[in-house]
A protein has these predicted regions:
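Conserved binding-pocket/active-site segment within a compact domain
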Residues: 101-178
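Short, flexible coil/linker elements and helix-boundary hinge sites characteristic
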Residues: 16, 36-39, 87-90, 135, ...
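N-terminal "cap/leader" segments of large eukaryotic alpha-helical scaffolds
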Residues: 1-34, 205-210
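Helix-loop junctions that connect tandem helical modules in alpha-solenoid scaffolds
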Residues: 10-24, 58-69, 97-112, 134-142, ...
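Non-membrane alpha-helical secondary structure
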Residues: 3, 7, 21, 50, ...
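Eukaryotic acidic, Ser/Thr-rich intrinsically disordered low-complexity regions
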Residues: 4, 166-210
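Amphipathic alpha-helical scaffolding segments comprising HEAT/armadillo-like alpha-solenoid repeats
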Residues: 2-12, 42-61, 85-99, 121-133, ...
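Amphipathic alpha-helical elements of HEAT/ARM-like alpha-solenoid repeat scaffolds that form extended
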Residues: 25-44, 70-83, 108-120, 143-158, ...
């Protein structure tokens, strides 16, 4: 473990001094770093992977090499897992970087995996439109599963979902189970979510009529 910590510390130090490296070397450094927040969780990594200044450096690298898709994917994956798994508190600058990356092909899939873990996400004005757009992100088979997970997460919090959004969610999920071959277990799982959304919709209509 000490050896792994030393490797991570060395990578962090290099990322702090990222302007000293060319794009090719930096891509290799970023690729090696990304494995740490993504792979097996370790409390020994917490001091480094909750470093807010390190996250700011990663954003700066991403903005500087905005056409390097491979580097951007590793940056988004790194920050996303730092926020989700290691509870890094991201600045608004970091969240804005994620929002900007929702329009980038290939990169946007990795954004969708962890953006809802950001504390700023719940107050983002476009969050509902974004949620509805997730199934259209390539690879679509993985994105619909991610979308379903996000819907279940929202339902578990008992947060009120706007009526029109609930209708959209129902349409997407019903269309998916009607056009896709899946196991009985998965069908039951999706039907359970659909039932909860229908209950949510009924409750919303009842509240409006009162």
């Amino acid at each position: 473990m000490q050896q792994k910590i030393k490797i991570l510390e060395d990578l962090r130090d290099k990322l702090y001094l990222w302007k000293s490296y060319n794009e090719e070397d930096l891509e290799k450094i970023m690729s090696a770093f990304e494995k740490f927040p993504r792979k097996e969780f370790s409390t020994f990594y917490i001091p480094i992977l909750t470093d807010t200044l390190l996250a700011e450096h990663l954003v700066a690298i991403g903005k500087t090499f905005s056409t390097n898709t491979c580097m951007l994917i590793n940056i988004i994956s790194s920050i996303g897992n730092m926020v989700w798994r290691y509870k890094l508190y991201p600045s608004d600058k970091v969240f804005n970087f994620f929002k900007e990356s929702t329009t980038l092909k290939k990169v946007n899939y990795y954004v969708s995996l962890n953006i809802s873990s950001f504390p700023q996400y719940s107050s983002w004005e476009e969050r509902w439109d974004y949620l509805i757009s997730i199934p259209n992100i390539s690879p679509k088979r993985k994105s619909i599963e991610n979308f379903h997970t996000e819907v279940k997460k929202i339902l578990s919090t008992k947060e009120k979902i706007p009526i029109q959004v609930t209708k959209e969610l129902l349409t997407i999920l019903k269309n998916y189970i009607n056009t896709t071959k899946m196991s009985d277990y998965l069908i039951e799982n999706y039907l359970n979510t659909i039932h909860k959304l229908e209950q949510e919709l009924k409750y919303s209509y009842d509240s409006v009529s009162l």
